[in-house]
Amino acid sequence: MARIAGIDLPKNKRIVIALTYIYGIGNSTAEKILEATNVDPNTRTDNLTEADVSHLRDEIDRNIKVEGDLRREISMNIKRLMDLGCYRGLRHRKGLPVRGQRTKTNARTRKGPARTVAGKKK
C-alpha cells in the first residue's frame, strides 16, 4: 500500500483516482502530477514501483500544499478576515453565509437547526 502525504492510498484503484483521496488534490491536479512524474494514470496503486511512489511523493512535497498545511492556511485566511473586521470576517464570526446568499429563509447549513421563536405566528 502506497503512503503519500500521510495518507494510505487505496490498493485496487487507478493511481489518478487514488491521488484524489489526498486533501488538496483533485482530478486535474492528479493528472498534472502524473504527467510531471511520467507515471501512467491507468496504473493500479498496488502495481506502482517504489521509484514511482518516491517520485510522486517528491513532486507532491515540492509543488503542492496538501493535508495539514492546506487546512492550516485556509483557517489562517479565515482568521485574518475575522481579525480585520471586514464584512466577510463579520459574517464568518456570526456564522452566517459569507457570499451574499439570502438569510430570511434558508441558510440552515450555516445557521444550524431552526430555533423557534415564542409568539411568532402569522
Swiss-Prot record:
Q: Answer yes or no on keyword Hydrolase.
A: no
Task: Enumerate the residue ranges of region (Disordered).
Answer: 97-122
Q: Which InterPro entries match?
A: Rbsml_uS13_C, Ribosomal_uS13, Ribosomal_uS13-like_H2TH, Ribosomal_uS13_bac-type, Ribosomal_uS13_CS
GO annotation (BP), single:
translation
Which Pfam family is one of this chain's hits? Ribosomal_S13
- Keywords carried by this UniProt record: Ribonucleoprotein, Ribosomal protein, RNA-binding, rRNA-binding, tRNA-binding
One annotated GO molecular function: structural constituent of ribosome
Claim: RNA-binding is one of the keywords in the record: yes
- Top-level taxon: Bacteria
Q: Which GO cellular component terms, listed alphabetically, does the Swiss-Prot or TrEMBL entry include?
A: cytosol; small ribosomal subunit
* Membrane spanning stretches: none
Known SUPFAM superfamilies for this protein? S13-like H2TH domain
Which residues constitute the signal peptide according to the record?
none
Database matches in PROSITE patterns = RIBOSOMAL_S13_1, RIBOSOMAL_S13_2
**Which purpose does this protein serve, as stated in its record?**
Located at the top of the head of the 30S subunit, it contacts several helices of the 16S rRNA. In the 70S ribosome it contacts the 23S rRNA (bridge B1a) and protein L5 of the 50S subunit (bridge B1b), connecting the 2 subunits; these bridges are implicated in subunit movement. Contacts the tRNAs in the A and P-sites.
Belongs to which family? Belongs to the universal ribosomal protein uS13 family.
Note the subunit structure. Part of the 30S ribosomal subunit. Forms a loose heterodimer with protein S19. Forms two bridges to the 50S subunit in the 70S ribosome.
Protein name per UniProt: Small ribosomal subunit protein uS13
GN (gene name): rpsM
